[in-house]
Amino acid sequence: MTQVAPSHLQTSNVFEDMLVVDTDVHVHESPGELAPYCDMPWRVALENIADRPETYLDIPSFSPGVSDGSYQAKFPTAHEGARMVWTKEQMRTELNQLDVDLGLLFPDHLLKLPVLTQTEYAAAIARAYNRWLVDKWTSQKDGLLGLIVACTHDPQDAAKEIAKYADHPDMVGVYLPCAGLDPLWGNPKYHPIFEAAQYHELPVLLHSVTVTHPVFPFNNHGFDTELARHTTSHTFSIMSNLVDMVTRGTFTRFPRLKVGVSEAGISWMPWLMMRMDKEYLERRRDVPFLREKPSHYLKKVYICTQPIEEPDDLADLVKVMELYDGEDTTMFASDWPHHDFDHPMKFAQVPFTDEVRRKVMGENALRFLNIDSTGRKL
């Protein structure tokens, strides 16, 4: 059933004359929704669980938090699962309430795609999601733009999917899942994905989520609260993957590839730049293929704001962005409709200049995605 966004979400006219591009919006792909789009025999697995209540954690192998029964993931909790968007009409209505002009769509369940244990099943689900997304959700006319899911288990198949959808007018990039990922994205195993994305001039976006999983950096079972796990999981995952990509030469091997990261906040980036530069000065013999300091490559990474830090003095966010030279690479993201989404009005309170605010709220995303203000590919 189509729902209307709660009235308290409505913004003022602050963004009335400003383009707002939300680079992290989540659709909800249930097993029943994906089943008709899934190849046999894996369609049977989805059909068998299609009529189960939407409780997430009792869906075997579809989107478990872990692959080892001795670990348990807490995502999503009942609170998180209480807010979903079921149709593009509902999504458009609610994004209008938030003054969002263009929304970049990520999945829900498939945030955890890497933890699936069966390669063929994972690839089939990724292909089904891509078909479902373009059929049911994406619409440049409605300002809803899609990302091609890259199956981490089968990079060759993922490269074929990128080639298949590269010219689709509504598919503007490639989603790289990070939750429970092993090996990290710097591994040469994934080169076919990066080669395809660079060839077709599509940006890639890394997105993580909280899971407890026996691979670095998700082996966070030492924590006993979700507060602790959520504090570290998203950000540590993104940091680890970027370090791996820099030190294995991903950025030098694919110099025209645009890379973005989502749902990790922004305050860690200055530290990572400084720390990597220090280590580089002492251990550059490990990475003779790097022609510049690590910070040179990290400054090219586009970074989505959600979940934005909330210091007592919001001017500190301006200073943080200056430290990583992020005026032209920071992109607004809300994480709508998840319970911890960031309202656009929060950014009206941060003392950015009008020029910087316009860049962060929309202009940087247009350049990253290579689209115009209507969502049309350039």
Whereabouts are the PLM-identified features?
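Catalytic pocket-lining loop regions of alpha/beta-barrel enzymes
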Residues: 3, 137-145, 150, 154-156, ...
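Aromatic- and glycine-enriched glycan-recognition loops and surfaces
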Residues: 81-89, 125-131, 182-192
